[in-house]
Amino acid sequence: MVREMFVGIDVAKAQLEVALRPGGVRFTVENSAADIAALVERLSGHEPSLIVLEATGGLEQPLSIALAEQGLPVVVVNARQVRDFAKALGKLAKTDRLDAQLLAEFAERIRPQVRDLSDARARALEALVTRRRQVVEIMVTERNRLHATYDAAVRGDIEAHLLYLQGRKDSLEQELMVLVQANPDWLSKAQLLRSVPGVGPVLTVTLLAELPELGCLSHKQVAALVGVAPLNRDSGLLRGQRGTWGGRATVRTTLYMAALVARRSNPVIAAFYERLLAQGKAKKVALVACMRKLLVILNAMLRSHTPWQHPLVPTPAT
């Protein structure tokens, strides 16, 4: 029987810490193009079942792309996912640093879904989605500064910057649309997604770029992947209600905004939301449930290649 091997790699600016599991082999290499190429070749010889890297603000991209282009199964995970996993095992204090051995254990026990990182077009789409999000975050910060500033010169400077940022945001959104329209598969999926009331262009491109598995997984799997599936967090003396945690935070945030719109404009989501409130659910709990329901609907539509059909929904009881 062939024994599976799992690899964790802790990426820093100067070096890469690598851990193999089982076996406990650990070694460190420089974070350079030459050493990355040598590491990829070395790992290829082990035929690992899964390689896990922590997202480190882009530092991980050269390595993750090189591994993917070699055909190796690599996953870039959010640090919070691994930290929650480690705390559940009692292996990590709040301020402890994640290491390669922990990432390897996470790979072996959790086995996160592998994403195709080798497609240059997909990387370009994700990069543009990320950049648009960054511009929006800067705009929010600048608007907050504007509200707190009374000096005329400073206000004028902030307003000019906001005008520039709005132009950049518009340009990025146009570039995203061009990319989607140039790819028949993305365009087909986008048309299906946009047929759903409450699903706009931002959620559409976010799902295409950051949740390419949509339509290929079960409802439970896709909900867990995004982080809207209710999960038990009981451990030792820690007992409580089920909650949602982990998953792809950027997708979840965008889905939250879409659910806010859908609870007013989508008859299915609106009726579902009112029914949960009538059952005594808190508004936040009901909204998270709406996020999950909307995601499940979108997953089913892409899997069956079926556009949205407006159902006859009875008016919720008041």
Predicted features along the sequence, with ranges:
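Charged substrate- and nucleic-acid-binding regions of tRNA-handling and nucleotidyl-transfer enzymes
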Residues: A278-Q309
